[in-house]
Amino acid sequence: MTRSPRRPLFAVSLVLSAMLLAGAAHAAVSNEEILQDPKNPQQIVTNGLGVQGQRYSPLDLLNVNNVKELRPVWAFSFGGEKQRGQQAQPLIKDGVMYLTGSYSRVFAVDARTGKKLWQYDARLPDDIRPCCDVINRGVALYGNLVFFGTLDAKLVALNKDTGKVVWSKKVADHKEGYSISAAPMIVNGKLITGVAGGEFGVVGKIQAYNPENGELLWMRPTVEGHMGYVYKDGKAIENGISGGEAGKTWPGDLWKTGGAAPWLGGYYDPETNLILFGTGNPAPWNSHLRPGDNLYSSSRLALNPDDGTIKWHFQSTPHDGWDFDGVNELISFNYKDGGKEVKAAATADRNGFFYVLDRTNGKFIRGFPFVDKITWATGLDKDGRPIYNDASRPGAPGSEAKGSSVFVAPAFLGAKNWMPMAYNKDTGLFYVPSNEWGMDIWNEGIAYKKGAAFLGAGFTIKPLNEDYIGVLRAIDPVSGKEVWRHKNYAPLWGGVLTTKGNLVFTGTPEGFLQAFNAKTGDKVWEFQTGSGVLGSPVTWEMDGEQYVSVVSGWGGAVPLWGGEVAKRVKDFNQGGMLWTFKLPKQLQQTASVKP
């Protein structure tokens, strides 16, 4: 059983906690604290419960034997009519929870009582252009500041104790289609963010800022042919063209509006000192307009955090013609290959394949399907490149209004979309929220216009099965086998948490937060929150007890883009709640995991 070294006696813990809240509530978040986040379950100061994004907690006071007694202790409403999709992961520092809501709002909440301490609402213009709902996925903490991105493509720094604005910087022009929905991150004292907007023909980029004052430090474009920069004393210094030169993998001038937006944010591997980001779809979707691999779209990138230099890349879907993106999280873990331990990273791609890479150099180790139906490719070659099924690429429109339609699986919303998976080092398994669906897709003619949708394609998403779309899967990265699965009627659209207590938590659009036995997949607990659970659950220790929190609120891309699937969820209610749970106190004190 994992117990904190600070907690020799329960009563002492209560006294210390009270002292912390009263006297040390203003303690600054340090870089060392961020790096040690996975080892300090009393706080959560990173998105992903650690800079590597494993979403694993070493706590086991709450475990597979007692989780059936888990009960709500408080709930907090985001209030007002600004509901829509809620996809944030909360952070917790010194008894205060920090999280975001739809429409670029930030809340600070007392983690013991659910009392709101402060709220910040960004003043958004009327012409914001988010592709996939007005969601936000969370904040970053550093020093005495809270950082988040807005739907009009700004970074905002707030005083974490008062919610007052310390600085605000424009990252990109929202009128071109840029926005920010992902949580930024802190790496070696730098504030790192990506951008969204690939559906509008923006040029993706990753940028680093001084968190104290918002000064831009470096910028790295994610489309081949664009110059990267470092900034000193406010002056831009050229730092190499992404990909070396324009036009190598893009025809004509399309690289100028190439998309590849790193819209989901990234993680950091301190062992290699690399930032790991994914990039989105190339623009436009009509692949016949842009023959070639279209780097660095639908790829994973490793960047030097000092200056943004690209150290390696791996492209999961070259010449993407299905909007499969490559943004999904790349989780660092140690992989045993023939008795040799490799510094690896894994990702479950929207295209339906699960990839294991060497995170020191990006080399392909292995890949395999993780969903039941993939039609666009017949497999992967020895380098991890897809073996295309040419009949599944939608046709060129030619002189017609649209080209020939084809049925493709998975659908463009992906075998797995944004919702983060989790890795449990005790079981050696990844827990992947996935979906089984397909689509009819066809290409159309398109010309770029600033701020307008730049797709050149049409589509209708369809379910593949009558009784389920979502599947929570436990996947062994070494064998490539699925260990267990749990089906869900609606598409899964929320993140996953796993713990040393042999538990896996995730939510459903039907409104349930659920817990599963990490080894067997048996459902061992659930709670109805009143609206779809799209957020990423967290767990932490406070006053000698283990808590679980999750955001509830239906929305996101599925009801907006889901075609026939959207009909399945049309009666699901929107919402905006933060739910927090724990065991009754007497069970917390006697908890243990049985062999």
UniProtKB/Swiss-Prot annotation:
Describe the outcome of a gene knockout.
Answer: Cells lacking this gene grow efficiently with ethanol, 1-butanol, and 2-phenylethanol in the absence of La(3+), like wild-type strain, and the addition of 20 uM La(3+) to the agar medium restricts the growth of the mutant strain. Cells lacking both pedE and pedH show no growth under both conditions.
**Residues that, per the record, bind pyrroloquinoline quinone:** Q87, R137, S181, G197, G198, W263, R350, N417, W493, A557
> Any idea where this protein resides?
Periplasm
Q: What is the effect of changing F412I?
A: In contrast to wild-type, this mutant is able to oxidize 5-(hydroxymethyl)furoic acid (HMFA) into 5-formylfuroic acid (FFA)
State the Pfam families in the record: PQQ, PQQ_2
- Catalysed transformations (reactions): a primary alcohol + 2 Fe(III)-[cytochrome c] = an aldehyde + 2 Fe(II)-[cytochrome c] + 2 H(+); ethanol + 2 Fe(III)-[cytochrome c] = acetaldehyde + 2 Fe(II)-[cytochrome c] + 2 H(+); butan-1-ol + 2 Fe(III)-[cytochrome c] = butanal + 2 Fe(II)-[cytochrome c] + 2 H(+); butan-2-ol + 2 Fe(III)-[cytochrome c] = butan-2-one + 2 Fe(II)-[cytochrome c] + 2 H(+)
Identify the InterPro entries for this entry.
Answer: ADHI, PQQ_b-propeller_rpt, PQQ_MeOH/EtOH_DH, PQQ_rpt_dom, Quinoprotein_ADH-like_sf, Quinoprotein_DH_CS
**GO CC terms:** membrane; outer membrane-bounded periplasmic space
Q: What is its EC number?
A: 1.1.2.-
Residues binding Pr(3+) are E199, N281, D323, D325
Please give the chief subcellular localization of this protein: periplasm
Q: How is the cofactor bound?
A: Exhibits enzymatic activity only in the presence of lanthanide ions; maximal activity is observed with Pr(3+) and Nd(3+), and the activity decreases gradually with lanthanides with atomic masses higher than that of Nd(3+). PedH activity is found with lanthanide concentrations as low as 10 nM and up to 100 uM, with a peak in activity at 1 uM. Binds 1 PQQ group per subunit.
Would the keyword Signal turn up in this protein's UniProt record? yes
Which chain regions cross the lipid bilayer?
none
What UniProt keywords apply to this chain's record, in alphabetical order? Disulfide bond, Metal-binding, Oxidoreductase, Periplasm, PQQ, Signal
Q: Which cysteines are joined by disulfide bonds?
A: C131-C132
Name the catalytic site residues: D323
Q: How is it used?
A: Is an attractive biocatalyst for the oxidation of 5-(hydroxymethyl)furoic acid (HMFA) into 5-formylfuroic acid (FFA), a key reaction within the biocatalytic route toward furan-2,5-dicarboxylic acid (FDCA) production. FDCA is a bio-based platform chemical with the potential to replace terephthalic acid in the production of polymers.
The record's account of how the chain is modified after translation = The disulfide ring formed between the two adjacent cysteine residues Cys-131 and Cys-132 is essential for efficient electron transfer at pH 7 from PedH to its natural electron acceptor cytochrome c550.
Similarity section: Belongs to the bacterial PQQ dehydrogenase family.
Q: NCBIfam families this protein is in?
A: PQQ_enz_alc_DH
The role this protein plays is: Alcohol dehydrogenase that catalyzes the oxidation of a range of substrates, including linear and aromatic primary and secondary alcohols, as well as aldehydes, but only in the presence of lanthanides, allowing bacterial growth with a variety of volatile organic compounds (VOCs) as carbon and energy sources. Is also involved in the transcriptional regulation of pedE and pedH, most likely acting as a lanthanide sensory module. Uses a specific inducible cytochrome c550, encoded by the adjacent gene in the locus, as electron acceptor.
Protein name per its UniProtKB record: Quinoprotein alcohol dehydrogenase PedH
Question: Native species of this protein?
Answer: Pseudomonas putida (strain ATCC 47054 / DSM 6125 / CFBP 8728 / NCIMB 11950 / KT2440)
